[in-house]
């Protein structure tokens, strides 16, 4: 990334949109001497073009410039490190949710219960939405897949392996490998 950043005009603000570990923007700024920001995007592989066009919110450093570029969007002012953590927190939670509902599906199957009825009852509460509760998932498989969740869970677990979140993610990753083989 440093090669690309160094080839850009010096007065060009640089926002990285892909998922990067917390602290990466700061390191890139220090290495290149440029202002490098992170502004995560929230895309689904199946609908990435529409998702990109209709991002509901924008957050990162230099929020005033972004208000001009993205008028009418919800703007949240935060550091790039906070934005980097938002993206990981979002994706890892999605993977946790998929894994949890796959476990509930598995229990329902073993107990002779109708998962769709149980799911509908759970979703009747306003605390949980239906995103990531479909079993099997949109790809027709169990567990989480795609390009983002597996790599993000692995990276987050590795980065925080000695922290409680790292300890939580190890069994999630193991369970997911069982579900994906299913």
Predicted regions and their residues:
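Alpha-helix boundary recognition
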Residues: 6-9, 123
């Amino acid at each position: 990334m440093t090669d690309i950043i160094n080839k850009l005009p010096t007065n060009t603000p640089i926002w990285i949109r892909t998922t990067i570990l917390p602290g990466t923007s700061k390191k890139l700024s220090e290495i290149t001497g440029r202002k490098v920001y992170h502004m995560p995007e929230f895309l689904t592989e199946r609908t990435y073009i529409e998702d990109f066009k209709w991002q509901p919110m924008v957050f990162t450093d230099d929020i005033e410039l972004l208000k001009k570029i993205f008028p009418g969007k919800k703007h949240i002012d935060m550091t790039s490190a906070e934005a980097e953590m938002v993206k990981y927190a979002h994706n890892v939670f999605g993977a946790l949710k998929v894994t949890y509902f796959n476990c509930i599906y598995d229990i329902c199957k073993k107990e002779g219960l109708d998962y769709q009825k149980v799911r509908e009852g759970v979703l009747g509460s306003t605390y949980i939405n239906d995103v990531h509760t479909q079993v099997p998932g949109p790809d027709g498989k169990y567990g989480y897949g795609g390009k983002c969740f597996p790599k993000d869970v692995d990276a987050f677990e590795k980065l925080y392996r000695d922290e409680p979140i790292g300890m939580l993610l190890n069994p999630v990753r193991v369970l997911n490998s069982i579900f994906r083989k299913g």
